[in-house]
Swiss-Prot record:
Mostly expressed in leaves. Localized in cortex, trichomes and vascular tissues, particularly in phloem. Keywords: Acyltransferase, Amino-acid biosynthesis, Chloroplast, Cytoplasm, Plastid, Transferase. Pathway: Amino-acid biosynthesis; L-cysteine biosynthesis; L-cysteine from L-serine: step 1/2. This is Serine acetyltransferase 1, chloroplastic. One of its GO terms (cellular component) is nucleus. GO terms for molecular function: serine O-acetyltransferase activity. Its EC number is 2.3.1.30. Induction: By cadmium (Cd). Not induced under sulfur-deficient conditions. Repressed in trichomes in response to NaCl treatment. It is found in: Plastid, Chloroplast; Cytoplasm. It comes from Arabidopsis thaliana. GO terms for biological process: cellular response to sulfate starvation; cysteine biosynthetic process from serine.
Length: 314
């Protein structure tokens, strides 16, 4: 199924081969790398992947010491799927769970589930647009553990749905140990997700997170006790959840809502409103909550609500 980096599959055009070889030769380190590549064609419309290759070329020009690292992680791969399977397998492997075993598992899931890589691209774009600390797609791809944890969860969730629960839970455990992010493989997570900093994020089994949601570090989407069944929060599209917030129980956070940092939320939050405090209260009051026009997940504004909270004291 797999071929070495220098071997082209039957059906590749000469243009495909020459285009990739040009990129490969530029980045080739001073030693041979025996890697297996599953995808052998760079798609012309894959703007994110092409941009990553361009960024990698620029980075290596600035820092030649990174040539081998970038070659192994980015430029020796002919697809985003292969590069993602590689970086996750390296990050999540240990002495008894070698990276080549994880690579084969991850690449098989990614090849069979193209929707995962589409979500990966949207996540990369989300991080680049919303996090001022992110200087490039490659920077996010190689070093942002929130992004990597989210992609590992997407693979684990696919395995969970296939009733391969033991290996899905194993991935959850390795992500928790490696990234300090604990997302149950049963949780449903949309695309365009930003897990900023990500340390201490916990998402329970029956939680649902919509599209274009931004979640800061130390956030818990948890249950309220030991009851089973549908017991975790449902987060709408475009929501911003501030650092250190706890959202508990089978409640709904409406589309475009904002949860202030450090809040404890145990009741539904209407769409386009702001909840803050412990226990959380709606800005403007329960009867007439103030609604905002901007999309919180994009503005990443975590403090404007403080001036509208009448009893805020410093």
């Amino acid at each position: 199924m797999a071929t070495c980096i220098d071997t082209c599959r039957t059906g590749n055009t000469q243009d495909d081969d020459s285009r990739f070889c040009c990129i490969k030769n530029f980045f080739r380190p001073g030693f041979s790398v025996n890697r297996k590549i599953h995808h052998t064609q760079i798609e012309d419309d894959d703007d994110v992947w092409i941009k990553m290759l361009e960024e990698a070329k620029s980075d290596v020009k600035q820092e030649p010491i990174l040539s081998n690292y970038y070659y192994a992680s980015i430029t020796s791969h002919r697809s985003l799927e292969s590069a993602l399977a590689h970086i996750l397998s390296v990050k999540l492997s240990n002495l008894n769970l070698p990276s080549n075993t994880l690579f084969e598992l991850f690449i098989s899931v990614l090849e069979e589930s193209p929707e995962i890589i589409e979500s990966t691209k949207q996540d990369l774009i989300a991080v680049k647009e919303r996090d001022p600390a992110c200087i490039s797609y490659v920077h996010c791809f190689l070093g942002f553990k929130g992004f990597l944890a989210c992609q590992a969860h997407r693979i684990a969730h696919t395995l969970w749905k296939q009733n391969r629960k033991i290996v899905a839970l194993l991935i959850q455990n390795r992500v928790s140990e490696s990234f300090a992010v604990d997302i149950h493989p049963g949780a449903k997570i949309g695309k365009g997700i930003l897990l900023d900093h990500a340390t201490g994020v916990v998402i329970g089994e029956t939680a649902v997170v919509g599209d274009n949601v931004s979640i800061l570090h130390g956030v818990t989407l948890g249950g309220t006790g030991k009851q089973s069944g549908d017991r975790h929060p449902k987060i709408g599209d475009g929501v911003l959840i501030g650092a250190g917030s706890c959202i508990l129980g089978n409640i709904t956070i409406g589309e475009g809502a904002k949860i202030g940092s450090g809040s404890v939320v145990v009741k539904d939050v209407p769409a386009r409103t702001t909840a803050v405090g412990n226990p959380a209260r709606l800005i403007g009051g329960k009867e007439n909550p103030r609604k905002h026009d901007k999309i919180p997940c994009l503005t990443m504004d975590q403090t404007s609500y403080l001036t509208e909270w009448s009893d805020y004291v410093i």
